[in-house]
């Protein structure tokens, strides 16, 4: 490695790789479960192409999904621990929105954007885990399931509302991941990406 070439610490690269693998497996296996009974349109509704699913059928998708659920919880725990340890650098603050809107300092605006992304990602991961647990063990986590009974006001069962909310975390997390990668590219280009990959 060239002395001038910056590399992120091994744990940072490993954590990013771990995050990506867990998300891809959870998303693909979740879409396989979705295909067994689509949220929109029931059994005759639109399905996701097999290319983007994992498991081959409902039971296979469930095996992958529930198998990685523990890793997802571990991931969330590590995320919380890291953010608490470095909360001043990573968690969004009340001034960050104002910085995005008013600051002419590009570096400060990018830092504020990163803080917002990290914080929103933490909220989304927690939300995905909570809605997943509410569907996995509805009797044990009845109080979580009950939070989604508001869907009945719009003619939907709380179970359907829960499924829609859980499914929505996939594109939301994917969007934040893309935003994080794009912002990192704008900050350091290929050099910064390479320092994370190898």
Task: Label every PLM stretch briefly.
Residues 1-198:
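Membrane-embedded alpha-helical bundles that constitute the cytochrome b-like, heme-associated redox core
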């Amino acid at each position: 490695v060239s002395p001038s070439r910056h590399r992120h610490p091994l744990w940072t690269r490993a954590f990013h790789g771990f995050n990506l693998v867990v998300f891809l497996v959870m998303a693909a296996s979740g879409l396989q479960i979705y295909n067994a009974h689509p949220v929109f349109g029931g059994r005759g509704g639109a399905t996701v192409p097999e290319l983007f699913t994992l498991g081959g059928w409902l039971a296979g998708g469930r095996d992958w999904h529930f198998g990685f659920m523990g890793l997802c919880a571990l991931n969330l725990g590590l995320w919380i621990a890291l953010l608490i340890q470095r909360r001043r650098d990573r968690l969004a603050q009340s001034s960050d929105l104002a910085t995005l809107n008013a600051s002419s300092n590009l570096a400060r605006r990018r830092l504020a954007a990163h803080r917002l992304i990290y914080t929103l990602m933490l909220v989304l991961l927690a939300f995905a885990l909570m809605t997943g647990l509410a569907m996995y063990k509805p009797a044990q986590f009845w109080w979580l399931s009950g939070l989604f009974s508001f869907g009945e006001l719009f003619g939907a069962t709380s179970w359907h509302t829960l499924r829609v909310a859980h499914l929505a975390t996939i594109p939301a997390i994917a969007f934040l991941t893309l935003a994080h990668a794009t912002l990192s590219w704008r900050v350091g280009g290929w050099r910064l990406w390479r320092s994370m990959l190898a």
